[in-house]
Amino acid sequence: MNPNFTTEHTWQGRHDPEDGQAGRRVHHIACPIQVGELANQEPGVALIGFECDAGVERNKGRTGAKHAPSLIKQALANLAWHHPIPIYDLGNIRCEGDELEQAQQECAQVIQQALPHARAIVLGGGHEIAWATFQGLAQHFLATGVKQPRIGIINFDAHFDLRTFESELAPVRPSSGTPFNQIHHFCQQQGWDFHYACLGVSRASNTPALFERADKLGVWYVEDKAFSPLSLKDHLTQLQHFIDDCDYLYLTIDLDVFPAASAPGVSAPAARGVSLEALAPYFDRILHYKNKLMIADIAEYNPSFDIDQHTARLAARLCWDIANAMAEQVQSIRHP
C-alpha cells in the first residue's frame, strides 16, 4: 500500500517575508511524508485523503466526491497557522472503480499506523469514509490493548446513514448510506457499547425505517428544524452528557448538513439544512474536549457541483478548526 501523494502545488500560498515566523500559514508547515515515517517525527496532526465516491454511487447519489481531498487541502493551504505543531500530509488513498472495501481497508491501515504518533483528520470522499475511519480507530485500540473503549461518534449530517447493508429481501451492499449501521454491528460483535449522535438530521430525507432503527439503537439525534437559540441550552446539556459518557470522541461532518446556499457542492444538497452559526456552539463544545478527540473526518464535498469554491472553503475552515484543537492538545502533552 502506497498512498498517492499530494503535489507540491497543493501546499502553496501567500508568503509574507516581512512578518518572519509570525507570517506562518498552513502551506509553510505542511509536510508530505509516508505514514511509516511518523514514528521518527515530532507529534503533530495528520491529514489523510480518501479519494472515493464508490459508496455514493452504490447509494444512488451524485458522484464526484473522489476529487475532493486535494481541493480541500488547497483551500486549507493559505489559512494562517498559530502553533509550532506540524501538519503531516500522509497522501490520498484512491479507490479504483468499485473496489470500495479494499480502499476502506487501506485507509484504516494508514489511520491505525498514524494514531500512535498523531491526531488524525481524514478528508473524503463520500461518507463511506466513516467505516474506514472507525475501523482505523478500532484497530488502533485493539492493537494497543484498550479494552471496551467507550467511543462517542458525533455525526453532523442530514442523514442517519444507518441503512441496511445486508438483506435477504433486496440486493444491498455497503455504501455511503450504511457506515454507522456497519459500526453498530462491529461494536455488537466486539461487545462494545454503541454511542452515536446525529445532529442536523432531516425528517424529509430519512424514511420511517431509518428513524425506527435510530430509536431502536438508542441514537441521540436532533432534527434540523430543532436548532434554535431557545433550544440551545437544552441541546448543549444533552451533548455534554453524551461527551461525559465517552472516553474518546470521533467527530464526523457530512457537508450536506449545511444549507445548499452554504454548501452547494455536495451529493445531496439540503433544502433547509442548519447554518454554521447555529452549529458553531456544538462544534466548540466538542473541540473543547480535545483531550478526547482522537480522530475526525469531513465527507461528501463534491467539487463537480461547487460554486466559486464555497463548499471547499467551508470544508477547509472546519478542517482548520479541528486541526487547531488537535494541535493545542498535542502541544499541551509536549509542554504540560
Swiss-Prot record:
User: Which residues lie in Polar residues bias regions?
Assistant: 1-10
Query: What does it catalyze?
Result: N-formimidoyl-L-glutamate + H2O = formamide + L-glutamate
Give one GO biological process term: putrescine biosynthetic process from arginine, via agmatine
* Entry keyword annotation includes Zinc: no
Q: Which free-text remark accompanies the cofactor? A: Binds 2 manganese ions per subunit.
Q: Name the positions where Mn(2+) 1 binds.
A: 127, 157, 161, 254
Write out the entry's keywords from A to Z: Histidine metabolism, Hydrolase, Manganese, Metal-binding
Q: Which PROSITE patterns match?
A: ARGINASE_1, ARGINASE_2
How is this protein named in the record? Formimidoylglutamase
Q: Which species is listed as the source? A: Vibrio cholerae serotype O1 (strain ATCC 39315 / El Tor Inaba N16961)
Q: Which gene encodes it?
A: hutG
